[in-house]
């Protein structure tokens, strides 16, 4: 094989078990985790991303055993503090603000408080603040910029 040719290890694996969100931790560990571990194994440069929109607090200790895990999705329904207890600084926590709160009633001050809370809960961990799964900006697209400014400032105060 040509040494310059890309390999699977050069890519990112997107691991998700959204269809298994209704499974409890025991069934998840028995039925889903083994195939996720096999899927993640070839990504030897630690380029595995785990995504789950549901609350993953109870499953995170199981997911933490994925080989080559580098990035973990912390949805608005998951606890940032629980993710930090599970992963520490071993992965980047992709921490998501709740888009419904941002676009349907939040003031700049509300956004700031929410972001500062997320940052404080993530003390000691590498984080990436995100606002995604946006289905409507409620006629206020400028809020995207406001949220981004507040997120940058919250991160800078860290």
Indicate where each model-derived feature is located.
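Active-site loop segments of alpha/beta catalytic cores
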Residues: 1-158
């Amino acid at each position: 094989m040509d040494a310059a040719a890309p390999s699977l290890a050069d890519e990112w694996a997107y691991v998700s078990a959204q269809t298994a969100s209704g499974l409890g931790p025991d069934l998840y560990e028995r039925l889903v985790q083994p195939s996720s571990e096999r899927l993640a194994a070839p990504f030897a440069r630690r380029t595995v991303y785990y995504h789950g929109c549901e609350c993953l607090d109870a499953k995170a200790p199981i997911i933490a055993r994925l080989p080559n895990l580098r990035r973990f999705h912390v949805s608005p329904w998951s606890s940032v503090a629980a993710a930090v207890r599970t992963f520490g600084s071993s992965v980047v926590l992709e921490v998501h603000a709740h888009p419904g709160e941002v676009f349907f009633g939040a003031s700049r001050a509300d956004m700031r408080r929410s972001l500062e809370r997320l940052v404080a809960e993530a003390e000691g961990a590498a984080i990436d603040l995100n606002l995604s799964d946006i289905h409507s900006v409620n006629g206020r697209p400028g809020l995207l910029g406001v949220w981004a400014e507040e997120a940058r400032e919250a991160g800078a105060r860290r």
